[in-house]
Structures are given as structure tokens and as C-alpha cells.
């Protein structure tokens, strides 16, 4: 009467495939799913070797703390803390899934230590804080030379990144229907990491530039209207802008604006996100406000959560110095 239900018998590769199918159904990015798959399969093969069986013969019910800990010890030796933590997270999610599906009685990942990872220092644009203003002003003046120049579009790309702190994938995922709210209280609904959504406030200067860009888009392609499902950011063929195109555009803007030497190594579009957060922090935005705006899941250890309302988050965003530049550009931009 008090006995446990028998465990569902399944080999590890089959369980991994079922887990990955669930991730795909939840619309996680292909890049994220691919990273999970690689880490799960590599550690799984190590675990099978330690157990003395082929990976196809390793049943999920035999995964225990000692075996997984041993597999991670082998896996960790040549790898960085970031890689180990990523694999740890992948396995923790897999084994939590296996428990929920009745393949395991409990998740053994508590027995597997994970390395402490130093918090990475932000990498905003170098200099005295004027680089973003120079970037916007020079691009607005037509500094970027291209076969098919489109200043209105370029300004919206840079402006949105600087006043919202969106990641590359988030910028590319914005549609016309993502923008809502009434005048003076506009917001962009963003789908971030892990499919989490957040609402980002935008102010009249960027609203005006978006409207001007959309008008130019209609004229450029001979259109009378755009559906709400249309991507906000497009290339010169009116196709949704892709990651490579976005990176190229931003790199070219840095170059022609003469600030490429102020972009730190390992950043490109992400430098604009770091610039956004750094300048707001300088103007007194709290850690919790920045966490909400950036879409982070936690605050750096040691910082207390600060109660924050939607109005306070908007006020923090309004302090972004990029808005002052965009306001001037919009006021003097005419129809160009």
C-alpha cells in the first residue's frame, strides 16, 4: 500500500532527446538547445564510461550523485568555470525533468559542486561617457557610407539599443505589435532569455524616430501599410534584419562615427547594452531597477532587492543621457 510507483525505465540518450523536444516546444532558441545538447551528451558519455557500459545502455534510474560527480570531475578538468556552470545547469534541468517524468526518485545534482564564477565587469564604450552621443550625432549626419544608405533605420537600431539595453536577439525579435501603450506611456514587449517577457518603457524621442523610420520604410518600398506581425528592424530588401546583418551594421556605424577604438574587445551590439546600464547606474538607478530593465534573473550577490514600481523603473529609464541626444536629433531631423 505504501510502496512507491515503479520508475519509468529509459536509457539516457532517449531521455535527453525527450528533454530537448520539450525545450524546443517551449520555443527556446536553437542556439540554447544546441548548447544544452552538447553538454548533456558529452557528460553522458563520460558517465557511461565510468559505469562501464555503452551510453545507450546507461539507464536514467542508475544516475546517482557519485556517478554524476565523477563525470563532472572528468568533464571539468580542461574547461573554464563558465563552461562547467553551463553544463551543470543543463544537467540540473535534465534531471529535474527526469524526476517529473518518473524516471528518477530525486535529482542527484545537489551532490555535484559547481565552481564560483567571478562577476564579469561591464564593458561600456570607453572614454568620458560621450561616445554614445558622438555615435548618434555622426550617424544622424550621414557619416555611415553605404551603397544604399538608410539613416532613419540606422538611428532606430542604435537608439533602441542605447535606451532599452536590449540584447541582439531581443532587438531582432521586436515586431510592430510589440510596441503598445498610450502616448507618453509607450512600452515594448520583449521576449528575453528562456522565453521570459518584460515590458520596457520608451520615451517620445525614440517614439518619434521610430515613426519617422516607419514612414521612410513605407516610401522606400512603395507600401501603404505594415502588418503588426512585421519585424520592426529590416534590411534594405525589407527582410527581417538577421544577427549577422545587425552586427555588420553596428560595426560599420562605430567605424564611420570614428569611435571603433572605444569598443572593448568581445563586445559589439552588447557594448550598447553595457553603455545603457552603466550610464543609468551613474545617474542613480538602483540594482533592482537595472535588473528589471535588463531582464536579468538575479542581482549580484550582496546587493539587496529594492522595491520598485513601474513608475520608478520608467523614471530610471528616463535618466538615460541618450534621450537628450535623440530629442535634439528628432527636433532638428525634418523629413530626412
Predicted segments, located by residue:
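Conserved catalytic core of the tyrosine transesterase superfamily
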Residues: 1-336
Amino acid at each position: 500500500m505504501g510502496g512507491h510507483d515503479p520508475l519509468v525505465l529509459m536509457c539516457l540518450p532517449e531521455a535527453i532527446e525527450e528533454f530537448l523536444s520539450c525545450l524546443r516546444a517551449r520555443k527556446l532558441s536553437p542556439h540554447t538547445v544546441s548548447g544544452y545538447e552538447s553538454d548533456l551528451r558529452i557528460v553522458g558519455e563520460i558517465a557511461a564510461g565510468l559505469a562501464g557500459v555503452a551510453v545507450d545502455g546507461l539507464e536514467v534510474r542508475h544516475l546517482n550523485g557519485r556517478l554524476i560527480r565523477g563525470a563532472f570531475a572528468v568533464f571539468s578538468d580542461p574547461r573554464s568555470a563558465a563552461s562547467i556552470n553551463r553544463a551543470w545547469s543543463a544537467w540540473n534541468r535534465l534531471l529535474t525533468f527526469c524526476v517529473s517524468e518518473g524516471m528518477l526518485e530525486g535529482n542527484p545534482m545537489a551532490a555535484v559542486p559547481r565552481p564560483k564564477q567571478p562577476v564579469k565587469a561591464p564593458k561600456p564604450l570607453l572614454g568620458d561617457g560621450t561616445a554614445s552621443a558622438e555615435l548618434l550625432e555622426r550617424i544622424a549626419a550621414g557619416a555611415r557610407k553605404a551603397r544604399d544608405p538608410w539613416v532613419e533605420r540606422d538611428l532606430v537600431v542604435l537608439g533602441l539599443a542605447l535606451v532599452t539595453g536590449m540584447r541582439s536577439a531581443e532587438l531582432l525579435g521586436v515586431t510592430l505589435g510589440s510596441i503598445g501603450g498610450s502616448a507618453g506611456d509607450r512600452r515594448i514587449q520583449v521576449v528575453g532569455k528562456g522565453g521570459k517577457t518584460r515590458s520596457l518603457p520608451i520615451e517620445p524621442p525614440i517614439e518619434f524616430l521610430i515613426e519617422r523610420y516607419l514612414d521612410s520604410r513605407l516610401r522606400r518600398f512603395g507600401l501603404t501599410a505594415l502588418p503588426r506581425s512585421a519585424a520592426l528592424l529590416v534590411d534594405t530588401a525589407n527582410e527581417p534584419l538577421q544577427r549577422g546583418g545587425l552586427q555588420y551594421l553596428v560595426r560599420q556605424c562605430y567605424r564611420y562615427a570614428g569611435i571603433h577604438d572605444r569598443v572593448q574587445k568581445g563586445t559589439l551590439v552588447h557594448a550598447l547594452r553595457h553603455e545603457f546600464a552603466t550610464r543609468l547606474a551613474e545617474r542613480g538607478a538602483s540594482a533592482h531597477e537595472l535588473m528589471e530593465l535588463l531582464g536579468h534573473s538575479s542581482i549580484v550577490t550582496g546587493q539587496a532587492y529594492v522595491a520598485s514600481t513601474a513608475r520608478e523603473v520608467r523614471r530610471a529609464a528616463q535618466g538615460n543621457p541618450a534621450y537628450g541626444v535623440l530629442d535634439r536629433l528628432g527636433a532638428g531631423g525634418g523629413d530626412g
